[in-house]
Amino acid sequence: MRKGPAVGAIFIILLPIFASACSSEPREYDFAVSVAGGPEGWPVWVEEVIVDQSWRVPAGGIEHGFDQHPPMGGVAVLGPKPAPGEIYARWFSHRTEKFYDVALSLPEDLDDKLRKWYRDYPLEDYSHTLIVGFSGKGEALAWWKAFCSTCNYDRSHDFSTPLVENVKGEVVEGDPGRYNVRTGEHVERGTIPPPPMWLIRQSDGDAGN
């Protein structure tokens, strides 16, 4: 009979601790990720995009979308995630034949903003997308977009806003010869003028990949 109060006391003490632990779990949001490139005449090959050092976004060759408002690119649906904080990316510009990388720091209050945006643009009617863009000029950006899926063709109900813009990527080491074939395809199509070093490699018989 004497054990009853003790057990009750333990329960009362542990319950707030358990509730506190649950409340500390980060809120997750259901959104997709879109990767834009370009702009036109500045095609890129995005080698990797890593969010919060934990999950990767597929990318590859991209020619358009960087200079649109909002930017546009291929979309990857990755499932619910916490509000992103940092995006690392590395990409190659076929026109400059340079490699760039960048670590985009997203706004510290993004989680608070997402809570509001998901209330204003609920998932029942909207699909949310984190948009990241990497240009052939070595620039990077990030936007957020909510696309109304129940508004037919009326795009006036969509929402989009820049998160980070006009960020300069750092030129890093890399072998442009790895992209000889893809760069050559852009030259043949007239997408870009022949890069000087690409012409030299071609004359030296370095066909590359």
Language-model-detected regions and their locations in the chain:
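Edge beta-strands of extracellular beta-sandwich domains
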Residues: 98-105
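C-terminal motif of bacterial Sec signal peptides marking the signal peptidase cleavage site
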Residues: 18-21
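Bacterial signal peptide processing site
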Residues: 23-25
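Tryptophan-paired
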Residues: 47-95
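Compositionally biased low-complexity segments at domain edges in trafficked proteins
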Residues: 114-189, 194, 208
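Bacterial N-terminal signal peptides that target proteins for export
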Residues: 1-10
